[in-house]
Structures are given as C-alpha cells and as structure tokens.
Amino acid sequence: MKRSILLLALLLCTTLSFAQKATYKVAQRDTCDLFMDVYEPVAIPGDTLDRPTILFVFGGGFVMGQRDDPWVLPWFKLLNENGYRVVSVDYRLGLKGVRMKFDLFHLLQSADLTKKAVDMGVEDVFASVRYLCDHAEELGVDPDNIVISGSSAGAMISLSSELEACNRTVRAEILPAGFHFAGVMSFAGAIMSDSGKPAYKRSPCPQLLIHGTADEAVQYEKMGFGRRGMFGSSYLVNNVLKPAGYTYQIYRYVGHTHDMAANMMANWPEEKRFLEEAVMGGNKLVIDCTIDDPTMPVLGFASVTLDDIY
C-alpha cells in the first residue's frame, strides 16, 4: 500500500509542463537524423549537490519507441523537479522490420541480429555523448558527471555502453580520452555478447539494476548457446560484478515480469538513494535486495514476451 500511495502522490504532483526543453540534432545517419531532447532542472534553493545529468535511452525491443514516449515524461519531470537535467536521445531501431524466431534452429541467428542492433544503438548513443562533451559549456553539462539510464532495449544499450567505454572498443573511440560514465541505471536490462561472459578492462561505474525475476522479454538470468548469449541482471551480479568487487545495487522483484522496465516512478526511492549515495556520495555500498511487494504496481504490458514483440 505504501508504494502505491507514493506513486499516486508523485503522479498527482507531477504535471507535464517542463521549465525548459530544447532539441538538438546530434548526428546524421544513412537512414535518419539523430536528435536529443534536453530537459532543464528546476532550481532548488540552497542545493549544493553536484547532481549528474541523466542520459536516457528509450526501450521498445529495437523495433519501436521514441525519445519522448508519453509514458516516460512524468519520470523526466520528477527528475527535473529534484534538480536533475535529463537528456533523452535517439538511436536507430536495428530490428525494425526484421523477422525474429526463437526456436532451436534460429536462436543463434536471432542472437546475432540482436547483438547487431545493440551495437548500432551503442554507436548512436556514443554520438550523443560526444555531442554533450563537445557542447558541455553551453548545455551546462559536466562530461565527467553523466549517468546513463535505459528501459528494456535502452537498458541493454546502456549496460553495453558502459562495458564498451571501459574496454575502449572501436565504437568507443569517438568518446574523449578518459571518458567514463558516473553511473548506470538499468531498468530490465542485459548485455548481449558473442564472446562469452562480459568482462571489464577497467573498473565500471556504480550500477543500479532493477529487474523482475520472471521477465520473459529481457532475461533476468542468462539465455544463450556457446559464447553467444543475453546476460541478464542477476547473472551479471552473481558472475561479473560481485566476484570482482565492483559497486552495484540490484533490486530483484519476485514474480514481476517485464513491467519493471517501466516502473521508474514507483522505484524513485531506490533511484534517489543510488544517485545521492553511490554516484554523488561515492559510497561503495553494495545492495542486493529481493523484494516481494504486493503494492508494487503491475503495468499493462507485464506479460510481454519475445514472441509478442517480434
């Protein structure tokens, strides 16, 4: 009941009028132009915190979605009202119009296609990051204080962006030397890999992972064959982040499915704590929390599966 009351209060207090929003063209691709929307924060009297810019990557299975999806705007407004600048970015939809099958005979092909779509998304997000860095002064952005966040496919791109930034891949060469994200907030995300278990060549930034334990769209654990696979939040914590002593906070919602990809408003207390303590405060506290909360809202697309999307 408490969480439902909190969500209702946030929605009632959050209108969709923004103090200031500006749109910028970031890059030109063969198939489309890429833009970003910048939502300016509300000035908080007496606030001395060095708040990061929140870069958001939308979801939609790499076949749909847009940077200003109506359902996510209340969350942007909530972040603005708490002093955070929000930058919502475009990326090309790498699986739009692609026929995907997930039976045994097509699993490897589908994994390769998904990895290609993630890579394309990372390339486009890095173009936006470069734009922010090159125009940091005029946009009021600190290049060393950017938290990347994403929902579903956007969370997959966000986690992969941090991995590639740490490993300085070819796609990451567009980033300024020494660039690093200040944090990652992943809502039902995973890392696609064609080279086995993900590994970081330098310590990653703090990561907030929110995932439903029964998610059938983006794996909570792992799905794959051989060195190809989708490595979900639980697998990444248990096999990558925890053994290496990296900083993470994971909230495992028992019985929830893919609805956790869009429950940012209900998870605001966890996000606020992560941003204030792990990102701004530098607290290396690790949180691994399994939550069975009947008051957590279940959204309309909770039962979505891969077959539903493709």
Residue ranges and their predicted role:
Residues 48-61:
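Short beta-strand element of the alpha/beta-hydrolase
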Residues 1-22:
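Bacterial Sec-dependent N-terminal signal peptides
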Residues 129-203:
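Primarily recognizes the serine-hydrolase "nucleophile elbow" in alpha/beta-hydrolase
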Residues 172-245:
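The feature captures the conserved acid-bearing segment of alpha/beta-hydrolase catalytic domains
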Residues 19-49:
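N-terminal cap/lid segment of alpha/beta-hydrolase-fold proteins
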Residues 239-310:
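C-terminal catalytic histidine-bearing segment of alpha/beta-hydrolase fold enzymes
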Residues 103-138:
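Alpha/beta-hydrolase active-site loop
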